[in-house]
UniProtKB/Swiss-Prot annotation:
UniProt name for this protein: Protein PsbN
Taxonomic lineage: Eukaryota, Viridiplantae, Streptophyta, Embryophyta, Tracheophyta
Transmembrane segments: 5-27
Known function: May play a role in photosystem I and II biogenesis.
GO cellular component: chloroplast thylakoid membrane
The species this protein was found in: Phalaenopsis aphrodite subsp. formosana
Gene designation per UniProt: psbN
Length: 43
């Protein structure tokens, strides 16, 4: 394959992986450990 094709596929794969990890962190199992500063601030 050409170098440009490999670079494009690699960057696309990294972007998809990062997006998947971010969604898992935000909505998956680790989201239980995230703190909510608005909920902590009692008015």
């Amino acid at each position: 394959m050409e170098t440009a094709t490999l670079v494009a596929i690699s960057i696309s794969g990294l972007l998809v992986s990062f997006t998947g990890y971010a969604l898992y962190t935000a909505f998956g199992q680790p989201s239980q450990k995230l703190r909510d500063p608005f909920e902590e601030h009692g008015d």
